[in-house]
């Protein structure tokens, strides 16, 4: 899933209604209103920099209505499902593909998906005995890549962590760090903690947590690869969040090689 922030909306009176998916491709993302929105979403009064209490806003038909202070600016930070893999969407759009099925990403951190992925890896190696190098492209989480309704690139950050989230992951993060997660830790006033920003302690905590968890899971796949008699190579690029070679956790994965595009 991915954290997204709406545009800034100025309240013309005592209420303001904010459409969530304006400027975002409906083929790429779908609003996650399944999980507790009062827990995982955040409405911000950007004029004061303070969150709006959940009892002062409501969601219906793809929009959030806020009990507002006139002329203050508001945004909504919300979770969205990635219903089309951003890299596949990029390739399809760039190359003008037609008549094809959209690929989706799945969360290997979830127990059932984790089990399936490890079994699938063993099955692939067993069924392809002529293969002696497994090249992973890459491990698990895509960097931030968002398209608008016309399938144009709206926002890209090769180092962005905003698409590496889910309530399952964030609950684990809270248990480890001992404080409550806020969407603003990732949204960062709409800057999404891009590389020109000074990261907050909370965002750095989240990055460190993600790197540890991703490295642990990637090592499991590399160990299976070695156990089955193959070398493990990582493509440096797509879905590489948490496997940055310049970070200390990377060396624990045990890869034999890294290749770039």
Residue ranges and their predicted role:
Residues 1-30:
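N-terminal low-structure segments adjacent to metalloprotease catalytic domains
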């Amino acid at each position: 899933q991915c954290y997204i922030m709406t545009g800034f909306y100025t309240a013309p009176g005592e209420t303001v209604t904010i459409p969530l998916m304006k400027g975002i491709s409906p083929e790429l993302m779908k609003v996650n209103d399944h999980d507790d929105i009062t827990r995982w979403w955040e409405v911000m009064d950007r004029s004061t920099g303070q969150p709006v209490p959940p009892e002062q806003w409501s969601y219906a038909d793809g929009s959030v209505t806020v009990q507002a202070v006139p002329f203050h600016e508001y945004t909504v930070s919300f979770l969205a499902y990635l219903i089309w893999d951003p890299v596949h969407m990029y390739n399809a759009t760039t190359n003008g593909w037609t008549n094809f099925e959209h690929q989706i990403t799945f969360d290997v951190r979830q127990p059932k998906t984790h089990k399936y992925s490890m079994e699938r890896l063993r099955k692939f190696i067993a069924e392809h005995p002529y293969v002696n190098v497994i090249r992973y492209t890459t491990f698990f989480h895509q960097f931030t890549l968002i398209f608008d309704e016309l399938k144009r690139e709206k926002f890209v950050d090769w180092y962005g962590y905003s698409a590496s989230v889910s309530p399952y992951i964030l609950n684990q993060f809270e248990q480890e760090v001992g404080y409550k997660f806020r969407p603003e830790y990732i949204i960062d006033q709409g800057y999404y903690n891009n590389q020109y920003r000074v990261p907050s302690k909370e965002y750095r905590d989240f990055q460190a947590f993600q790197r540890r968890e991703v490295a642990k899971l990637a090592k499991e796949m590399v160990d299976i690869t070695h156990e089955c008699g193959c070398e493990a190579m990582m493509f440096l690029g797509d879905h590489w969040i948490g496997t940055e070679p310049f970070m200390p956790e990377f060396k624990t994965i045990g890869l034999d090689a890294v290749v770039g595009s």
